[in-house]
C-alpha cells in the first residue's frame, strides 16, 4: 500500500471551448488559477481566448510531439516581458500560439496591407496557416522572444518581424509635420524624436542595429531601406499595386 502522501492527483480537461461559451471559459480559467494553485491541472485547447488568459508561465506549446514551456528560464523573455505580456497579450494576439508562421507588425497599416498583397500574389496567408500579430507600435521584440529558447531547442515556427526604419526623407518634415520646417535650419534642435536621411551617416550599421534587437533562432527582422514599408513599396515601382490594395481595403 502506498502512502497517501506519495500519490499524485491530476485533473485533465480537454478542449473546454467545445462545450462552453466564451464567458464560461473565462470563468473556468479564473477559478482554476485562483483555487487550483496546489493542484496539478492539465488543460488542452485550441482557443486563443483561453491561451490569452492563462498565465504565460503556465503555458506549454505542443509541436511535433514536443512540449515547449513558456515559463521563465525556458524562453528569452525577461521579467519585464512577462509582466508586459500578461497585460497586453489578448485573444487576438494569442492566435500566434496556434499558427504555422507568424508575422509581427507595428500598426494597422501593415496588418491590413500584407494579407491583401498576399492575396494579390495568390498566396493567401490563412491557407498557409500564417497569423499576423499587430503590436501597435510597441512590444515587437517582446512578442518575438516568446519563440526564442534558452536551451537551444528551437520551436519550428518561422517568425517575421516587420518594423519601419523611421527615418524620413529630408523633405518630409515640412510636408508631414509643420510647413515651417521647409529648411534644415528651421528644424527643432532639441526634444525631437524624428530623424531624416541626411542625419544617418552609416545606413547599413543603422539597419543592422535594429535587426539585431530581435533576430535569433527562428525570428528574423525585415526593415525597409527607406522610411516605412508603404513608402518603400511605392518608391520601388509598386505604386499602382499599393493603390489597388488601398482600393481593395475600402
Where are these regions (language model features)?
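Switch/communication elements of ASCE P-loop NTPase nucleotide-binding domains
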Residues: 1-94, 111-112
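Acidic, divalent-metal-binding catalytic cores of TOPRIM
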Residues: 60-250
